[in-house]
Amino acid sequence: MGEKISLDAYLTNNPIEGALFFLGKKLSVKDDKGVVSGIIFETEAYGGAEDRACHGYGNRVTPRNKTIFQRGGIAYVYFCYGMHYLLNFVLGPEGIPMAVLIRGVWITEGKERVRERRKGIPEKHWADGPGKVTRSFGINDSDNGVSLIGDRIWVEYSGIVIPETEIKNTARIGVDYAGEWAKKPLRFVWEKK
């Protein structure tokens, strides 16, 4: 096992820095059947009460979004479109809504477990979207608020250093309702060469 990412890394006040930081890191999730791990290759930054695509827009706290207002270092998992759970890493100090959405992971460990969960899906598509990430890792609403430095979900340094030339920066996906915020280049994809 590599070195776990410390709590300090989750306390950044800059969701863009956070989204870039987690590219190339190793996400691991443990259940009673073992551990599934993989390298994060796609993220999106969400942050601050002014971000119309962020669940904390306008500092409105609801039962659904209250996790994003907590101190960084926990998982924010929610159900989207009545179909998918999505995994976010909460960032920053308590009271400021910031998170990084985990959009894509290359599975490196626990492949047999993922093969069971993703029957009939080619390996290259197991976790190449945010809903696919949670299905592959077995993440659901019971993981909302779980520590990211604990024994259920954690992130490690992988030893990978990504050249800036391999990071594609685009607008976020699925947030057309957010006006000018929909066009901001807050999605980051590692285009592995």
Curated annotation (Swiss-Prot):
Gene3D superfamilies: Methylpurine-DNA glycosylase (MPG) (3.10.300.10). Its EC number is 3.2.2.-. GO terms for molecular function: alkylbase DNA N-glycosylase activity; DNA binding. Keywords: DNA damage, DNA repair, Hydrolase. InterPro entries: Formyl_transferase-like_C_sf, MPG, MPG_sf. Pfam families: Pur_DNA_glyco. It comes from the Bacteria. PANTHER family: DNA-3-METHYLADENINE GLYCOSYLASE (PTHR10429:SF0). NCBIfam families: 3mg. This is Putative 3-methyladenine DNA glycosylase. It comes from Methylacidiphilum infernorum (isolate V4).
